[in-house]
Amino acid sequence: MENYSINLPSYSIGDNVYEKIEKICSPYGSKAVVIGGHKAINSAKELLISATKDTKVSIIDFVWYGGESCFENVDELAENESVKKADYLFAVGGGKALDTTKCLAVKINKPVFTFPTIASNCSPVTCVSIMYTKEGVFKQPFFFEKPPKHAFINTSLLCKSPSKYLWAGMGDTYAKYFESSVSSRGEDTLVHYHRLGVVISQMCLEPILKYGKKALEDNKNKVNSYEFEQTVLSIAITTGIASILLTAEHIIDYNTGLAHGIFYGLTSFPHIEENHIHGEVVGFGVLILLLVDKQYD
């Protein structure tokens, strides 16, 4: 008999999900500190202030995450007075800002809620932070037991973000299908959560093929369409759930593979980190993976 626990994500998606902040966050306290990138905070600040006005949730400060997902920035944030005073953390931005804040939340034992401002990865709901050196070279995955308390996925905000992030996010998403299916091939004794993760990863590919082209066009035109929402769900939620299941033992054997390995290796070259988005390089890595696996079609 196996004994284990799996903690799956909680999330809201739509064009007015910030209205749910008080109901979802207030049981954890009243004081929130927002941590994120400069651009992300600027894009979400007024929405967050408006959504928490005259509620039981008070935003006490907006704090820059430091510019890189690294332990040095986590340690510095832990000493920030507003962070110390807050009951919980609002992580706002892209993957690195969210991963930094998630790691911080574990370090200081405070709840964290995520507010993605771009749809480029599954960081809003995963139980891992990808950590780099201060110079941007991949260092390690930092695993923890539970995902953020809740992810607020505001599609009206996301559809106004640069389309290059959605484009890259699709590459990061379908990589989950190819990497997990290749990594698990031939293994007939996968435990339930690994097998479930592999099956769910199929939804990391199918919606991208079905809705991705239209979603990208709509994102370029800042249209919050059904196709855009379905693509965002695949990028942020489906991939995140698959990731949690595939790394339940905090081992990346089934969750990642050659495509991500290529990206992590290339981060040692400064121009890669400076000029290319994570999912963009991972998408290229998928092509290499398919060639190595002799999937030429």
Which role does the model predict for each range below?
Residues 3-5, 26-27, 82-84, 105, ...:
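Solvent-exposed alpha-helices and their adjacent loops that cap or buttress functional pockets
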Residues 1-87:
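ATP/NTP phosphate-donor binding region
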Residues 81-104, 108-119:
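A short, small-residue-rich loop immediately preceding and capping a beta-strand
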Residues 31-33, 87-90, 111-113, 149-151, ...:
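Structural motif
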Residues 191-297:
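Active-site segments that bind and position negatively charged phosphate/pyrophosphate groups
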Residues 18, 41-45, 96-103, 122-125:
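Short glycine/serine/threonine-rich phosphate/pyrophosphate-binding segments
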Residues 9, 108-201:
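A glycine/threonine-rich phosphate-anchoring loop and its flanking beta-alpha core
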